Every structure is written in C-alpha cells, then in structure tokens.
UniProtKB/Swiss-Prot annotation:
It catalyses: 5-(methylsulfanyl)-D-ribulose 1-phosphate = 5-methylsulfanyl-2,3-dioxopentyl phosphate + H2O. Binds 1 zinc ion per subunit. Belongs to the aldolase class II family. MtnB subfamily. The keyword Lyase applies. It comes from the Bacteria. This is Methylthioribulose-1-phosphate dehydratase. The lineage of its organism: Bacteria, Bacillati, Bacillota, Bacilli, Bacillales. Coiled coil: none annotated. It is an enzyme of class 4 (lyase). Catalyzes the dehydration of methylthioribulose-1-phosphate (MTRu-1-P) into 2,3-diketo-5-methylthiopentyl-1-phosphate (DK-MTP-1-P). Pathway: Amino-acid biosynthesis; L-methionine biosynthesis via salvage pathway; L-methionine from S-methyl-5-thio-alpha-D-ribose 1-phosphate: step 2/6. HAMAP family: Salvage_MtnB.
C-alpha cells in the first residue's frame, strides 16, 4: 500500500500542475501512473471528475486487464483506460498523460491527413532526449474512432518506447515517460512545439504546409 500511496501523491501533483494550465476543460483528459509490475497495477483517473478539484476519489487502482483492482467503491475508470493498459503492457513507461488543448487539437487537424507532424531544429527538442544538432522529432497522428478497443489497438502500434507521444485527431495528445517527471516533461515539450508552430503559421500564413 505504501507504493500506491506514493504514486497517488505523484499523480495528484501532476494533475494539480496541469489543471493550473487549464488543460482539463469540461472534465476531459486522463492520467495514470504505474504502481507495480508483477502483477501490473496502475492508478488511473476516475471518469467524469472535475480534475481542477482534489478529492479522495480522483484515482482508482487498475489491474493488468484494465479492470478495477479493488472493490468497495462505485468509481468508474476513464473510458480510455485500455490505452494506458496497452502502454504499460508493451513498454517500460511508468506514467501516461492525456490532455485536450486547443493547440494539440488544431495541430492534429492541420496535419491529420499526413498522419504525422515533424519538428526540426527547435531547442525544445532536447527535452525529448535528442541532443544532436538540428535534431528532428516526428509525432504520429492517429484517427479517433468511437470504438475504444479500435482506438487502443491503433495507439498500441505507436507505443514502442519508454517515452513518447501520439496525437489523436481532434481529440488530444497522449504522452508518456518512465516516471511522472519525464512524462510531464515530454508533454510540456510537445505542447511548446505545437504552440510555437501555430504562432509561426499565424505570422507567416504562406507556410501552412
């Protein structure tokens, strides 16, 4: 239980920081953090909660099958818990953050037909662990089917490393890392890149594509 309580505090702190940025409009978004590997368990945000508020029912423990691991409560896990389950099954990720922002939604629509967007030469790319000069990073953009298992299967194809990110078209970004700190850093880096790119497009509209 000590591990669960420690992970709870970590995830609550991340949720607090992201909520302060207004990255959870209309109860959107979901967060998780791994508690154990054998068997796999992780905490995930409860469905339908206002993530700007802090309560004792913000998260619930999930098992390796994506189901609640504890009884005695009526909480429902986030509708997209299956994506988190696949991520922890396939990689050594320890934390996963999914947020809906205007910037990531606009980027996903602008480049959705291309299925990806690439950034190059930005200093912020170093936050993703890419230190070579003029480094580039590509973010895949997947479709957003209403059927969650189909979305999770598509997402799983791109979840192959301990840290990374995937854009879901007109839906949001899912970013992850081996720790809560790394996951938040990855998320912040991509949101910066999205914001910078859109600002450049607004100043130089001829460079839209």
């Amino acid at each position: 239980m000590a591990a669960k309580e420690e992970r709870w505090r970590e995830l609550a702190e991340v949720k607090r920081e992201l909520a302060e940025r207004d990255w959870f409009p209309a109860t959107s978004g979901n967060l998780s953090i791994k508690v154990s590997d054998g068997p796999l368990t992780f905490l995930v945000t409860a469905s339908g909660k206002d993530k700007r508020k802090e309560t004792d029912e913000d998260f619930l423990l999930i098992d390796e099958y994506g189901k609640p691991a504890e009884t005695g409560h009526s909480l429902k896990p986030s509708a997209e818990t299956l994506l988190h389950t696949y991520l922890y099954q396939k990689t050594d990720a320890g934390c996963c953050l999914h947020v809906h922002t205007v910037n990531n939604n606009v980027i996903s629509e602008l480049y959705g037909d291309e299925k990806q967007i690439t950034f190059q030469g930005q200093e912020m790319i170093k936050a993703l662990g890419l230190w070579e000069e003029n480094a580039s990073v590509t973010v895949p953009i997947i479709d957003n089917p209403a059927h969650i298992p189909a979305l999770a299967e598509n997402f799983a194809h791109h979840a192959a490393a301990g840290s990374g990110a995937v854009l879901i078209r007109n839906h949001g970004i899912t970013a992850w890392g081996r720790t809560a700190f790394e996951a938040k850093r990855v998320l912040e880096a991509y949101e910066f890149l999205f914001s910078c790119h859109l600002k450049l497009l607004s100043l130089r509209p001829q460079l839209v594509k």
